[in-house]
């Protein structure tokens, strides 16, 4: 799946992949609804991570590529 993702791709977070991951444990457990329910845009890529911007007034976040799916 990672081969399909590139800068500018629209993505959605895969809840099953994100839950109980290191990234989830490092975050507040009360994730906002937009995190799983909306799409984001990949702004940058780094090996196995993507910098994702959601279309809400919140900071962009780094997520593992295996936690994302193309929309």
From Swiss-Prot:
<keyword id="KW-0520">NAD</keyword>
<dbReference type="GO" id="GO:0016655">
    <property type="term" value="F:oxidoreductase activity, acting on NAD(P)H, quinone or similar compound as acceptor"/>
</dbReference>
<keyword id="KW-0874">Quinone</keyword>
<keyword id="KW-0813">Transport</keyword>
<protein>
    <recommendedName>
        <fullName>NAD(P)H-quinone oxidoreductase subunit O</fullName>
        <ecNumber>7.1.1.-</ecNumber>
    </recommendedName>
</protein>
<dbReference type="GO" id="GO:0048038">
    <property type="term" value="F:quinone binding"/>
</dbReference>
<keyword id="KW-1278">Translocase</keyword>
<keyword id="KW-0793">Thylakoid</keyword>
<dbReference type="InterPro" id="IPR020905">
    <property type="entry name" value="NdhO"/>
</dbReference>
<comment type="function">
    <text>NDH-1 shuttles electrons from an unknown electron donor, via FMN and iron-sulfur (Fe-S) centers, to quinones in the respiratory and/or the photosynthetic chain. The immediate electron acceptor for the enzyme in this species is believed to be plastoquinone. Couples the redox reaction to proton translocation, and thus conserves the redox energy in a proton gradient. Cyanobacterial NDH-1 also plays a role in inorganic carbon-concentration.</text>
</comment>
<keyword id="KW-0618">Plastoquinone</keyword>
<comment type="subunit">
    <text>NDH-1 can be composed of about 15 different subunits; different subcomplexes with different compositions have been identified which probably have different functions.</text>
</comment>
<comment type="similarity">
    <text>Belongs to the complex I NdhO subunit family.</text>
</comment>
<dbReference type="GO" id="GO:0031676">
    <property type="term" value="C:plasma membrane-derived thylakoid membrane"/>
</dbReference>
<keyword id="KW-0472">Membrane</keyword>
<dbReference type="Pfam" id="PF11910">
    <property type="entry name" value="NdhO"/>
</dbReference>
<keyword id="KW-0521">NADP</keyword>
């Amino acid at each position: 799946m990672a081969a399909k993702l590139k800068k500018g791709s629209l993505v959605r977070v895969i809840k099953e992949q994100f839950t109980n991951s290191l990234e989830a444990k490092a975050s507040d457990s009360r994730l906002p609804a937009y995190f799983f329910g909306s799409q984001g845009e990949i702004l940058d890529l780094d090996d196995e991570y993507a910098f994702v911007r959601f279309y809400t007034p919140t900071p962009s976040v780094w997520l593992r590529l295996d936690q994302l799916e193309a929309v």
